[in-house]
């Protein structure tokens, strides 16, 4: 039996340190809910989780981008829907004004409303915007001819969607079914029967053009909607993978904490007894 060095006490102190360290680690994991709280816990796992977290935050941002893109396209589509409704009313007026039994004087009541509807078409085309970006007037300074959406967390992964230049229908030319052309809607008139007939045919082409424009916007919204679903699913899968690596098993950690708590208490008791060994030897020698 050694007297100068209390080997049992030293070993017990080391066990006590390890048990206390294990209990502290289990308590930290229970408190944070994470198995990895520092690189000391799992350096490789922490590196993987960090990359996964970066990817998932990028995917979440891409989902928001696509959702904003859908909002933008819905704004443009809603405005085109209003323009289509206005054109339908203008067509109704043109058809009524085409009636040969009306005099030019009789048509004045249609002309006034027809002119005000032309102004409203311009108003819709001029003022429709999203976040101060002109959507239907590509002649404006802050106009957009195409919207580019960052589709994922990868650089330059863009979805490009062309916008419809509704303002161009105002001063441009309209090709009729006969092959002839007329000026844009701003020049249409129902002042007489011939003008009303021409306006009716022109409005049919305008409505068709706007319908085609809305179809393009609808296709863009559909694509963005699928992209939102895709990146959301990727983000969920990435977060689940990170969770399986990083998050603590609460039941297992509770069991670990209980185990180390018991071992720590036992180590303290054993250390107390080990420290009494020299005193017992002294008493034995004295006796």
Curated annotation (Swiss-Prot):
Residue ranges of coiled coil: none
Cell location: Secreted; Bacterial flagellum
InterPro entries hit by this protein: Flagellin, Flagellin_C, Flagellin_C_sub2, Flagellin_N
UniProt KW keywords: Bacterial flagellum, Secreted
Keyword Secreted belongs to the record: yes
One Pfam family this sequence matches: Flagellin_C
Top-rank taxon, per record: Bacteria
Gene Ontology MF annotations: structural molecule activity
SUPFAM superfamilies attached to this UniProt entry: Phase 1 flagellin
Keyword Secreted attached: yes
Predominant subcellular localization, coarse grouping: secreted
Gene Ontology cellular-component terms listed: bacterial-type flagellum; extracellular region
Family: Belongs to the bacterial flagellin family.
Biological function: Flagellin is the subunit protein which polymerizes to form the filaments of bacterial flagella.
UniProt name for this protein: Flagellin
Originating species: Listeria innocua serovar 6a (strain ATCC BAA-680 / CLIP 11262)
